[in-house]
């Protein structure tokens, strides 16, 4: 099938790790030919979070339609493709299985190479649509389930030099938003309120100066919930804008200061922002500001909002790198909810 002989490499990406069903056709790992995302936010809203059974059911309903639509928008057939890339893990096992089984079936039926992709590798490679990577580079990955600093010295070589010891930042955002009675997904709502508020509560900045690159957000979450509870006990209703701004200031301070310190220590050429929380305006603005001041020679890459949340273009981009390195998954590949980034 000589995919590598052709000038262009066309990969179909499939993503179903949580509550988005997505498919995308990507050319040469850096050009989006089509990208289709079916979101389930409305279905999970009334539960205040993702319900795994509902997510799986939605994936079953959407997967075929989404793949067909991605091929149609790209104006290609399965025979034009060089391979199929799919999120293998981590994520919700029932959700992952839908995408993995669809990818395995398509690859098998059309005799195409299959490439399993780590979900976080996908988030990092979403930045590949912005510019070429120059190593060494550092990624700040911030999402609902992950908060990590990932050092890369070459394509597909990941070293986690810092990670959360408890809650991920996105998780803390959602829990705090719920306490304030905000709609799901909470991170977006907190970010909006924070714009019009002040950091009047000065919540703790955990592990800010401990010398490590690790994070902790459970103390901040508890402090926020206790402060709100105590104020309400006294019959006071705090300004939600100030509460949101104070919470966000604490998270952003820690994320940005540790990221800048790690980037300096490792002398990176590029600094990448990745993951769902990369859409947060407060975080984006602060990172741009600090990099200008502290790391004038480092290129900061921030993905467009459309590529921050879960999508399949990023999976196809990461999959293309593995594909061109000759990596292949067997047709008996299984969903792996505990897949580690450093093991791929």
UniProtKB/Swiss-Prot annotation:
Its EC number is 2.3.1.234. Fe cation binds at residues 119, 123, 310. The keyword Metal-binding applies. GO terms for biological process: tRNA threonylcarbamoyladenosine modification. It is found in: Cytoplasm. It catalyses: L-threonylcarbamoyladenylate + adenosine(37) in tRNA = N(6)-L-threonylcarbamoyladenosine(37) in tRNA + AMP + H(+). Its cofactor is Fe(2+). GO terms for molecular function: iron ion binding; N(6)-L-threonylcarbamoyladenine synthase activity. InterPro entries: ATPase_NBD, Gcp-like_dom, KAE1/TsaD, Peptidase_M22_CS, TsaD. It comes from the Bacteria. Required for the formation of a threonylcarbamoyl group on adenosine at position 37 (t(6)A37) in tRNAs that read codons beginning with adenine. Is involved in the transfer of the threonylcarbamoyl moiety of threonylcarbamoyl-AMP (TC-AMP) to the N6 group of A37, together with TsaE and TsaB. TsaD likely plays a direct catalytic role in this reaction. Belongs to the KAE1 / TsaD family. NCBIfam families: gcp_kae1, T6A_TsaD_YgjD. This is tRNA N6-adenosine threonylcarbamoyltransferase. It comes from Listeria innocua serovar 6a (strain ATCC BAA-680 / CLIP 11262). The lineage of its organism: Bacteria, Bacillati, Bacillota, Bacilli, Bacillales. The gene is tsaD.
């Amino acid at each position: 099938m000589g995919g590598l002989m052709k000038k262009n490499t066309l990969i179909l990406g499939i993503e179903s790790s949580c509550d988005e069903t997505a498919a995308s056709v990507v050319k040469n790992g850096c050009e989006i030919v089509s990208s289709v995302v079916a979101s389930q936010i409305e279905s999970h809203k009334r539960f205040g979070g993702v319900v795994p059974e509902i997510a799986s059911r939605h994936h079953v309903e959407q997967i075929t339609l989404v793949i067909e639509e991605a091929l149609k928008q790209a104006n290609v057939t399965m025979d034009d493709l060089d391979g199929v890339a799919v999120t293998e893990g981590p994520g919700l096992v029932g959700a992952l299985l839908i995408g993995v089984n669809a990818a395995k079936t398509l690859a098998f039926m059309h005799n195409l190479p299959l490439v399993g992709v780590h979900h976080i590798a996908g988030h990092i490679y979403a930045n590949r649509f912005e510019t070429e990577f120059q190593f060494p580079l550092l990624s700040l990955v911030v999402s609902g389930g992950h908060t990590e600093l990932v050092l890369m010295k070459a394509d597909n070589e990941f070293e986690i030099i810092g990670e959360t010891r408890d809650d991920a930042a996105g998780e803390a955002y959602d829990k705090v938003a719920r306490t304030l009675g905000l709609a799901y997904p909470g991170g977006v709502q907190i970010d909006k309120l924070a714009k019009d508020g002040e950091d009047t509560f000065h919540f703790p900045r955990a592990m800010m100066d401990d010398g490590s690159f690790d994070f902790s957000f459970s103390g901040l979450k508890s402090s926020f919930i206790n402060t709100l509870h105590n104020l309400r006990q006294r019959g006071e209703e705090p300004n939600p804008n100030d509460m949101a701004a104070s919470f966000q200031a604490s998270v952003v301070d820690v994320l940005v200061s540790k990221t800048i310190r790690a980037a300096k220590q490792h002398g990176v050429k590029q600094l990448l922002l990745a993951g769902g929380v990369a859409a947060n305006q407060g975080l984006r603005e602060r990172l741009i500001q600090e990099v200008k001041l502290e790391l004038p020679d480092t290129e900061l890459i921030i993905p467009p909002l459309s590529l921050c949340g879960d999508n399949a273009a990023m999976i196809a981009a990461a999959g293309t790198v593995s594909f061109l390195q000759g990596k292949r998954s067997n047709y008996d590949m299984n969903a792996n909810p505990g897949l580690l980034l450093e093991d791929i």
